[in-house]
Amino acid sequence: GLGGRLDSTNEIPCPVLSVVTGIDYDHMAILGDTLPKIAAEKAGIIKPGTTVLFGEGAPEAEAVIRETTDRICGAQAYHRTDYSRIALAETSLDGTAFTFAPFGKLRLSMCGMYQLRNAANVLTAVELLRDKGYKIPDDAVRDGLASAKWKARFEVLSRDPIIVYDGAHNPQGIAASEANIRQYLAPLTPDGKVHLLMGVLADKDYRTMIAALAPYAKSVVTITPPS
């Protein structure tokens, strides 16, 4: 989905909670070529009576989400995820252990610092829903996070040899992919480099993607997907 005004979920007339996890350059031919334009499209999920949660993004993008919320729902409806509440315990290809006050010890089956931030968005959303009267048990939250899977997001396909598949396709995603290679894969090789198999659609910023990943490449094989 495109996430916002043109997304299929926008058929919901009055969502209880609208969450904008982050805003970056993506689907620019449809959403616009600046962050404020993209944010304006994302803001299409904000409806009267909705509580709005914003994760992260450039100040000019957040300003659009906040202003739209203020205009449609009132200033009291706007909330922002506080990532400083995250405390990392340990992380590996097997998953991530962390705490997020006041939920206590939690675990993700996924790795990557961005998945911690996604989890923080989820936990903040749970708090906002509880404020609205929804009964969401702590055990359900813990079990949900521990069992959550996200295909093609630094997904470990094989252990011997280690093969990881990542569908990152915008600058924000590639930055996360680069950080994951540096943290999880580079330490497992003598020279800190890995073999890359890479294919990029024509409308993506492939130059930025290649520049970010090239320092970790022992070899590169490219494919050309239909686009």
Q: Where in this protein do the model-derived segments appear?
A:
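Glycine/threonine-rich flexible loop motifs
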Residues: 3-9, 29-32
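Nucleotide phosphate-binding/pyrophosphate-handling subdomain across enzymes
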Residues: 6-19, 23-24, 37, 99-219
